[in-house]
């Protein structure tokens, strides 16, 4: 009987440590990098003037006007910023969804859309998902200028002469 009491006592003793609680601390740490840039005042709200263009130059679907340069100035940039993705969102043209749709109205042009191009003059489709955008290298701690172009492109012929207006919003994703 005494042996049974010792065995039961030993078993209860082995199970006892699981019943005790100990104070412990988990430390979680990290670092928030200064890896963003501010959009300079001149780039917050601006207009790109596509100039006056003759309707006859839109002789075929895909015909374009000369590209007009514009830029987005990022200043100041953080000391850890390395790159940025720039996307443009807006109402897409119903015929060519890579283009911005022209605003409608009584004196509005029709049959064309606005194409946005990167600094190499390659098309940047509107409303493109972030995963399809390329990273542009930035210089940390300095002002960075991102160059783009805009132009009109015929989506149908003949085009209707009139006022050209379209609106795009740009988004920035920093690395």
Whereabouts are the PLM-identified features?
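Mature extracellular/passenger domains of Gram-negative fimbrial/pilin and adhesin proteins
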Residues: 2-4, 20-175
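Sec-dependent signal peptide hydrophobic core
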Residues: 4-12
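N-terminal signal peptide c-region/cleavage motif recognized by signal peptidases
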Residues: 16-17
């Amino acid at each position: 009987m005494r042996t049974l009491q010792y065995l039961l006592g030993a078993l209860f003793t082995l199970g006892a440590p699981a019943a005790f609680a100990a104070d412990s601390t988990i430390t979680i740490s990290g670092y928030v990098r200064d890896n963003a840039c501010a959009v300079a005042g001149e780039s917050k709200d601006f207009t790109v003037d596509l100039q006056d263009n003759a309707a006859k130059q839109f002789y075929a679907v895909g015909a374009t006007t000369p590209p007009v340069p514009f830029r987005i100035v990022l200043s100041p940039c953080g000391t850890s910023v390395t790159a940025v993705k720039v996307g443009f969102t807006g109402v897409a043209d119903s015929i060519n969804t890579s283009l911005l749709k022209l605003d409608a109205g009584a004196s509005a042009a029709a049959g064309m859309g606005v194409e946005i191009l990167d600094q190499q003059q390659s098309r940047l489709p509107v409303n493109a998902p972030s995963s399809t955008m390329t990273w542009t290298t930035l210089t940390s701690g300095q002002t960075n200028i991102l160059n783009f172009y805009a132009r009109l492109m015929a989506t149908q012929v003949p085009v209707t002469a009139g006022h050209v207006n379209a609106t795009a919003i740009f988004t920035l994703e920093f690395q």
